[in-house]
Amino acid sequence: MALAVRVVYCGAUGYKSKYLQLKKKLEDEFPGRLDICGEGTPQATGFFEVMVAGKLIHSKKKGDGYVDTESKFLKLVAAIKAALAQG
């Protein structure tokens, strides 16, 4: 069964490309193992929130910024690997 990864991003801010970039990178890292969905907010929220199996792992609103560095990406990878290991 695929692991749920949900990204809520600011649609009004034009963050869809950042979401699609992250989605592709995660799909390349975990081919066929993730169910990734994104939701763009219609109003300007500044959101770029990433949840793995319902748990908030990355939050731009809480100061994490975008997933724009290798260390931020590896934090997501570690959370996904842990969730997959729990099955």
Curated annotation (Swiss-Prot):
Keyword check for Cytoplasm: yes
Annotated SUPFAM superfamilies: Thioredoxin-like
UniProt KW keywords: Antioxidant, Cytoplasm, Glutathionylation, Redox-active center, Selenocysteine
Keyword RNA-binding attributed: no
Modified residues (S-glutathionyl cysteine): 37
Subunit structure: Interacts with DPYSL2, PRDX1, YWHAB, YWHAG, HSP70 and HSP90.
Function (record text): Plays a role as a glutathione (GSH)-dependent antioxidant. May be involved in a redox-related process. May play a role in the myopathies of selenium deficiency.
Protein name: Selenoprotein W
Protein source organism: Homo sapiens (Human)
